[in-house]
């Protein structure tokens, strides 16, 4: 009898979370409309404005080797493959803008975070576009306006 109870407990801890995750993604897709489509994106220009207004946080979801090679100097770094274990580190009161060099991985992170109840977007022009947007005087002004990147 104890084995049956133990087996049922183990089963409930493995099957129920998977079913809940599937249900959350189903709900996200069922509610998907033109407003959601527009709201899930942020350009570099929009991101920088949101950060200056203290409404958003950049989430760099690249592999740690990529981040060690080059980084923005602000935002949070959680590799995409660590996001399921670390998403609770993210603030719930800010827009989370997920970013990678282009936008393939960041769109996955955005969808995942939305199923977890976060107001998440992905960076449409990627970190390469953000680097371009922060050239020269733009970088200086951003640092002065936000106090970031000491």
Predicted regions and their residues:
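Short hydrophobic beta-strand that contains or immediately precedes a catalytic carboxylate
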Residues: 47, 55-62, 78
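Short, surface-exposed ligand- or partner-binding patches at beta-edge/loop junctions that are enriched
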Residues: 98-100
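Rhodanese-like catalytic fold shared by cysteine-dependent sulfurtransferases
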Residues: 3, 18-45, 50, 68-95, ...
């Amino acid at each position: 009898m104890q084995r049956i109870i133990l087996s049922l407990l183990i089963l409930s801890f493995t099957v129920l979370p998977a079913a809940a995750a599937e249900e959350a993604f189903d709900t996200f897709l069922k509610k998907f409309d033109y407003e959601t489509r527009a709201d899930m994106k942020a350009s570099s220009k929009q991101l920088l404005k949101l950060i200056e207004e203290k409404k958003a946080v950049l989430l760099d979801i690249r592999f740690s080797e990529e981040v060690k090679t080059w980084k923005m100097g602000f935002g949070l770094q959680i590799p995409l493959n660590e996001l399921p274990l670390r998403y609770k580190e993210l603030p719930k009161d800010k827009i989370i803008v997920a970013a990678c060099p282009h936008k393939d991985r960041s769109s996955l992170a955005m969808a995942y975070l939305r199923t977890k109840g976060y107001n998440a977007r992905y960076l449409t022009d990627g970190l390469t576009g953000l680097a371009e947007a922060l050239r020269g005087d733009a970088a200086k002004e951003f640092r002065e306006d936000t106090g970031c990147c000491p």
